[in-house]
Amino acid sequence: MLEHKPVLLKESLDYLKCKENGIYIDATLGRGGHTEEIIKAINDRGLVIGIDRDHEAIESVKKRLKKYSSLRTVHDNFTNIPFILEQFNIKAVDGMLFDLGVSSPQFDNPERGFSYRKEGPLDMRMDKNQELTAEYIVNNFSHEELTNIFKEYGEERWASRIANFIIKSRQHKPIKTTLQLTTIIKDAIPASARRKGGHPARRTFQALRIATNDELNILKKTINHVVKFLKPGGRICIISFHSLEDRIVKKTFRELARDCVCPPDFPECVCDHKRKLKIITKKPVKPGENEVENNPRARSARLRVAERVLN
């Protein structure tokens, strides 16, 4: 099992510009790597709220970082940040960090169902209290629904063919495990295509994970909802791990950094939209060669940063 290493740690902290007595949100607590460094950058009168959908992550961090009095952990979805802040009676924060994707402990634990290399139940839920699982999707969604998921969330060239093989297979017996699904995907993709582009199941598993957890819809909704809780000058830092996430972050930041979002053919502005953000990173920040060498899972990471402005 790989040790979980926080990605783009120095870059995130540099852009977050943590200050003493500050209030910060780590919206994806994970194993607390970023959180711990934020805590160290503020004094005891500051506050870090760590949020995660995964109860195991929350319990692990509470135990590991129990010596820090400035940490509060919340088992919840980051889309509920407005309600979480209300519970803490906090009106605005100095910064927010989002580290999207699956943590190493989640990915390496076969029982979570994220890995296409290890046998385990076809689960893929970030939050185990959630009802929808990848197993349900694979065994109940129609050919059209599966194809759309694999195309939209996995950018999988063989989406329709994979969906067809899944439906034929589940007619004989339910698809319940990760390696069972991996075998079906391998059979569906032509041999010539399997020899390039990484593991043949990678895109399909990514698509199922995103669909199971509604990751992209939640991401866009959350960015739009939480920026108003940043103090002027406060920053939002988002680390993404694939192009679908990065495009959403880029597009949403751009929309929030514009004064007018009317269609270009409108003769005058009627939207009354006021810019909320200033984009700090014109291009995404990528990990350096040393980080990728020491932590191969950092290779696809992209960091984008924006700053709250006064309307």
UniProtKB/Swiss-Prot annotation:
Record's subcellular location: Cytoplasm
Output the Gene Ontology terms for molecular function.
rRNA (cytosine-N4-)-methyltransferase activity
Q: What class of enzyme is it?
A: transferase
Query: Primary place of residence?
Result: cytoplasm
Task: Cite the SUPFAM superfamilies for this sequence.
Answer: Putative methyltransferase TM0872, insert domain, S-adenosyl-L-methionine-dependent methyltransferases
Q: Which Pfam families match?
A: Methyltransf_5
Identify the residues that bind S-adenosyl-L-methionine: 32-34, 52, 78, 99, 106
Q: Name one GO cellular component term.
A: cytoplasm
Coiled coil segments of this chain? none
**Catalytic activity, as annotated:** cytidine(1402) in 16S rRNA + S-adenosyl-L-methionine = N(4)-methylcytidine(1402) in 16S rRNA + S-adenosyl-L-homocysteine + H(+)
Q: Name one GO biological process term.
A: rRNA base methylation
Q: What EC number(s) does its UniProt record assign?
A: 2.1.1.199
Alphabetized, the UniProt keywords read: Cytoplasm, Methyltransferase, rRNA processing, S-adenosyl-L-methionine, Transferase
- Give the family this protein belongs to, as stated in its UniProt record: Belongs to the methyltransferase superfamily. RsmH family.
HAMAP family from the xrefs?
Answer: 16SrRNA_methyltr_H (MF_01007)
What does this protein's UniProt record list under function?
Specifically methylates the N4 position of cytidine in position 1402 (C1402) of 16S rRNA.
The protein in question is named Ribosomal RNA small subunit methyltransferase H
Query: Which organism is the protein's source?
Result: Halothermothrix orenii (strain H 168 / OCM 544 / DSM 9562)
